[in-house]
Amino acid sequence: MKDIKRLKTVHISEADLLIIAVIVHCILKTDKMYVNVPALIELKMQKFDKHFQLIVLEKEEFIDEVKDKDIQAFTEIIPHSNEAVHSIVVPSDVYDGACIGNFQDRMTLAHELAHYILHGILQIPVSELQDGEICSKYEDPEAIADMLARFLLSVCGLVQNMSTAELSAECGLSEQDAVSVQKEYKEGIAKILFSIKTVLFKHKISSKSAA
C-alpha cells in the first residue's frame, strides 16, 4: 500500500451529507432504526455495484498490507477497463466487532462506506494538499466521511428527534458520536432551510420584476 497522503476535496456541508444519507437509505430501502453495517455493505452494496467488493483480511495480513498499525480499514478505487473497481478492506477483528455491534467498529465500516459513496459512486474528486496548505473540516475527506458515516447510522433516529441516549441505544452509536451527529443534523437542517428561503426570495424578486 502506498504512503498515506494528506488530501482535500471540494466543500461539502452538513446539508449535503444529510441529503446524501437520506437518498442512500431511500435507494437501498433501509428503514430499520439500527443499521446492520456489514450486511448493508455485503448484501445491498454488492447488488447495487457489480464492481464493489468487501475484503476481510486476517489482522496480521492487514497490518502487512498497510504497514501501519493505526489504520483500521481503507477504501480503494482502482481504474480498470474504463470502469472502477471499488474495494473496502478491513481486518477480521474490525469486521467481527461490527457484526456484534461494537460502536467503534461499526463507525469504522460506516466511515469506509462513506468514502465509497462519496468518491466511488459520486466521484467527488480529491487532491493532495501542498506543503503548508490547510483545509477546513468541510474540505477534509476524513472529517467529511466521519460526518456522512454518522448520518448513515442515525438518520432514521434523527428525524424522530431522538435524544443522545436513544440514538446511542437504538442506532448503535457511541455517546460521543450521538452528540456530534445531533449538532451536525441541526446545522444541516438549518442550511437546507436557508437554501430554500433564498430560492423562494429570489423567485419572489424575479416575479415582481417580471410584473
Question: Which residues are covered by each model-predicted region?
Answer:
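Active-site hotspot residues in diverse enzymes, especially metal/ion-binding acidic/histidine motifs
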Residues: 1-211
